[in-house]
Amino acid sequence: MALRQRRWTSALLAGTLSFLTACEGQISDAANPRNPGPGGTNNPPAGVEQPARSARVARLTHAQWLSTVKDLLKLDAAPTALAQSFRADPSQSGFLFDNDARALSVDEALWGAYQRAAADLAGQVATDATKLGRLLPAGSTTDEARAKAFVESFGLRALRRPLTADEVESYLKLYREGPKAYPTMAAFQGGLRLVLEGFLQSPLFLYRVERSTQAADGKVPLDAFEVASRLSYALWNSMPDDALFAAAREGLLAKREGVAAEARRMMADPRARGVVDAYHQAVFDVPRYASIRPNTTRFPNVTTKLAESAAKENTLFVQDVVFGRKGRFADLLTSRDTFVNDELARIYGLTGNFTADFVPVSLDGAQRRGVLTQVGFLASHATSIDPDPIHRGVFLSEHLLCQKIGAPPANIPALPAPNGRTNREVVTSHTEAPGTVCASCHATLINPLGFPFENFDAVGGYRTTDNGHPVDASSTPGIGGQKVSVKDALDLADALATTQAVHECYARHWIEFLSGRPAVAEDDALVARLGKLSQSGQLPIVDLVVEVVTGVGFVTRHPEELP
């Protein structure tokens, strides 16, 4: 009986949802096969900030779904157990982040998981007077009037825009079918349960849909609610709050200063911290920290918790620079101030009574400067016994200079035993021998960026000798199109922090992260402007983010869609 009722309810919901989806057109196919390239036009005007092609329809990531459901239903905690059956969000090759709209689709398995989650959540709320009461607007007298007020208020929040009259009536029809779907429940609660299921299964909830299509001066201005949605998912990874909806309703998001005011308010909200941390975890490759497995015979003073400690340090460090100090990108690369526990203190050579709790410290300025000299980066780019200048160099090239390096040739042999040589000598002889297939990349792009870190061992401890020989950390890497001589990692950190190309790369990552698409030629003018301001010290990270979300490329859309 329960299964038959569930099938009947699903069929009823499917009919209603198909009507509501039809109101928006075909939202499942945003591709236009006539569009050139993956996001950019062929010849955008140089120096002019403009929108790139983007998806009009983008599925919520699983993290966004969780935070949106929590905020929409006003739950005490996100329903993480329900999302465990969601297949993992796919990554897009060459894209650092997990929110690329091109990769976010819905297959049959995920759709089924969404349906089950919607039914579960609707049941939880509709059968709990306290939870349902949080969502019901006050003032209506009859059940029908209360249901209509609920559909209008909840629908605004669920679809991130006001409902049309036809949509309101469609959900009211669904409400009226509640007694048939849930005959054992009171009619009002049963009707709202079915309405909740309908909203939570709607493609207009599961996707962020931008309906604006009217172009002006080669751009499609987004309406106020579309701007609000872009802002909230960029800065909070969730739906707009009441204040942001009010700003949209009152027309405050039609001007740059209104968008900037909301962006600054949102960046001061604790929810922005999670987004800022997620961005830097991807840029600094913090998930790689989980691979830290030092040889305990070689390094007896470290424990299996080193990876966890390193990740915690990175989070505390980034949050302090961005929010505590209102710092700049250069501060991430050069600051000596960080947070340590007892295990990290041992590696950093600090004296004092440290415990498992993290405390703020200033590291030795003769040895440490910025995130690249912290344990997390160094130990995660090392073998269990030796530093790994190759992967350290590749990381800098790709993540900080935005220079992609191709995959290595197949069947490359492992590094040979040192046999009395330093780690640098082994790597050099193995990868830079004239005429070898490796030399072209390693001698110019990889090794020169990795060798300055030879003063740091496999767990990030500072050293001056290697295998009985003095460490040579000098190098001449190419940074921003110029050869720069550095004597060690401290010099390198300073060189990176003062090079505009590095700041442009950091800004480019932010544009990609906040927009959910790869940066393309249309972004170059904004990248150059932000890179210049950041390099000159005039742009704290919070201000950089605000500049991105108030730019023309964020509040308007290219007339052509991203395939």
Q: Where do the protein language model's features map onto the residues?
A:
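Thiotemplate assembly-line natural product biosynthesis machinery
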Residues: 62-68, 72
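Hydrophobic helical h-region of N-terminal Sec-dependent signal peptides
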Residues: 13-17
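GGW-centered surface loops in extracellular recognition modules
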Residues: 58
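Active-site substrate-binding loop specific to GH73 endo-beta-N-acetylglucosaminidase modules
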Residues: 24, 48-52, 70-440, 444-501, ...
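Bacterial N-terminal signal peptides that target proteins for export
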Residues: 1-12
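Short, low-complexity, disordered segments immediately C-terminal to signal peptides
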Residues: 27-43
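C-terminal motif of bacterial Sec signal peptides marking the signal peptidase cleavage site
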Residues: 19-22
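Axial heme c-ligation environment in periplasmic c-type cytochrome domains
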Residues: 515-518
